[in-house]
Amino acid sequence: MATIFDILKTLNNNNNNINNNKIESCKRQYTVNKRIDIIPSMDVTMTNDKLIIETELPGVSKNDIDINIKDSILIIQGEKKNNIIKLQQQQQQQSEKSSQSTNNKDDDEPSIEEYEDDTKLKSNLNKNTENKDENKTTSSITNKKFISERSFGNFKRYLNLSEILYQLDLNSINTQFENGLLTITINKKSDNFQIKLKSI
């Protein structure tokens, strides 16, 4: 025969499972299929007339930040890109474009039959391929990492506003991004809009 403690323990375990399932479903609802690599630091201050949210995002471009309010949750998300990798990709694209343009130039050059001496052409081609090989080896040498301590990738931060949302004027949201600090300011509603309860 089960004691009252066994019954209470079973009920408690069932409630915990239900609550955990609700939390997981909420997380899944707000999580995009991107991996979150960085959780930025945040300060939230409430003054008499506004709510101030400051988030540290050093090294992040202004264009890579997305701010949303959904179901009374403020979501700050984006991507901190590695500038070296971005630079390498741009250089690679430029080199591909230049190689394509040199291939087009080769089409404009006279054919081998029009050259008086075939040996000059072969020596020029050999020099060009040697120069390209030298450029590849020097670029691979310059990309060695000695120390790598900075973080890059996707970031996301949530702020639950459900307890104070009724006090805020969402039409007055103001954002600033300067020196790696994102500042979101939301004004409070004026006193005229506050709900006052009458005593009975």
From Swiss-Prot:
Pfam families assigned: HSP20
Domain sHSP: 33-200
Compositional bias per record (Low complexity), positions renumbered to this chain: 88-101
UniProt-listed InterPro entries: A-crystallin/Hsp20_dom, HSP20-like_chaperone, HspG1-11-like
Superkingdom field: Eukaryota
Keywords: Stress response
Stretch list, region Disordered: 86-139
Protein family (similarity comment): Belongs to the small heat shock protein (HSP20) family.
PANTHER family assigned: HEAT SHOCK PROTEIN DDB_G0288861-RELATED (PTHR46827:SF1)
Protein name: Small heat shock protein hspG2
Native source species: Dictyostelium discoideum (Social amoeba)
